[in-house]
Amino acid sequence: MARLFLDDSFTLAKKVAEADIFIGFAPESAADWFAAVCAGGELISQGEGDLGARLTRLSGEVFALGYEKAILMGTDAPFLGANRLKETLRALKAPQTVVLGPAFDGGYYLIGLTEHLPELFDAIPWSSDKTLAETLKRVDKLGFKAHLLEIERDVDTPEDLKWMLDNWRQLDPNKSLSYHLSKSIQK
């Protein structure tokens, strides 16, 4: 299932023509596998630490290369569409903006940045129902504007996966279940 999520996320990112794609991967020993699966994307090791440390490292690497904006997204939001990435890019045209894609569980499935903000990710209660709320407080404290995308369901638990498998056909027709995953479910 994780491979299908990765395939779909990579395919989605490639649909956004104005984007270079970087793949944050772990563990280090999986570099060759990720290079083969995500041909055409640049690999960046996530390194060690909690999610905040890894997001800080990944965004820092991208901004150090001279990029003026970065979108970091997980591979566990199978209903995310290209229109959401395009909305994120439009919102990031405004300076000092942080774009967040809220998840139903209180976290977020995507974050877009206009600059490297290590303080944004420090001491956040990751994987909790307070992750988004605490991140929004931090955005405000740093003097940035938050742009919230439409809320989505991500797949973090067996219950989330069951919900997805039970309900994927009943979703809003403007949302599309990712290609590789939907083909697998139909089998």
Whereabouts are the PLM-identified features?
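Short, glycine-/small-residue-rich phosphate/pyrophosphate-handling segment
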Residues: L117-R138
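Active-site rim beta-loop-alpha module in soluble metabolic enzymes
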Residues: A103, L113-T114, D122
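A short, N-terminal amphipathic alpha-helix
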Residues: A2-E18
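Short aromatic-hydrophobic micro-motifs that form the base-stacking/packing surface
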Residues: I71-M73
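Conserved donor-nucleotide/metal-binding helix-loop-beta segment in metal-dependent transferases, i.e.
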Residues: L80-D105
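Short phosphate-binding loop-to-helix
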Residues: W33-K69, S128-T131
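Conserved alpha/beta core of the MobA/IspD/sugar-nucleotide pyrophosphorylase nucleotidyltransferase superfamily
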Residues: A133, K137-K187
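Short beta-strand/loop segment that forms part of the nucleotide-sugar
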Residues: E18-P27
